Amino acid sequence: MEKSNNYKQQWLPITKKETDRLGWDYVDVVLFSGDAYIDHPSMGCAVIGRVLEAHGYRVAIVPQPNWQDDLRDFKKFGKPRLFFGVSAGAMDSMVNHYTAARRKRSDDAYTPNGRHGARPDYPTIVYTKILKSLYPDTPVIVGGIEASLRRLSHYDYWADALKPSILLDCKADILVYGMGEKPICEIAKLIESGTKISDIKDVKQTAIIVNKSDCPKENDDSNLILNSFENCLNNRIKQAENFKHIEIESNKWHGKTLWQTANNKCVKVNPMNEPMTEEEIDASFDLPYTRLPHPKYNGKRIPAYEMIRHSVNLHRGCFGG
């Protein structure tokens, strides 16, 4: 990774005053997150922001934007030069909001003072729809655990219903699943080189919506056609079969491209990247994180930070997984 020459401050900017202080007249990428901004390598938004910064891009973060007012948080940096990035946060928003008994939780570990209500249900959908309404011509890339787990048809426990890919609901241009450093940097380079977002179709570890006619007619060595969303809706065994295929292909070094038709469209899920090398993951952890919450929180307690403040990252992903 090449370190950015414009690194002049400790935290990535989250306010217009900070970008003005840096002398920026534009921002390359604006990242929206359902979590408070903690500049630590255990927080996905911080990692993606720092990795993009290390590649020379100007990155701003909008943590926990207000989606219920005049949408000023979504407008404060204006239109980025490359794209918007959206993540619900380090935890699935519905797990964050509700107990297993579907009762509303009273706190949020990723919010200052543990306050509940700083993010909506399904922020991936809510934030992306707002951005698409304000900036219809600007690409929106979604990622994080909420988007990753919903990249294909999935059972939503809280709605007690089978739902199609979250891409069909949020209308994002690309979904990045799993560890996102490699795909997000590749996407940034392609957009910067002049490639249209609609032409970015084959980046590993991404999912996109294509026309139904683009779906292959039969399986081969590199493509696997899943049961359609409609078939899964009518037969839960079909959904179980899909789940098995998705898990198998997600754990292969050279998996197949997955295809699933839904609502007269087709979801294309490109295979995983090979695991990060020791050098790559060390480079990611060695970026200039402050390992602190942003000063705007004025020392307010963020429970998730209290848990990891003295920790050292040993791995990526869920240790139990």
Can you say where each PLM-predicted feature lies in the sequence?
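Catalytic cores of nucleic-acid editing and processing enzymes
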Residues: 1-5, 9, 32, 70, ...
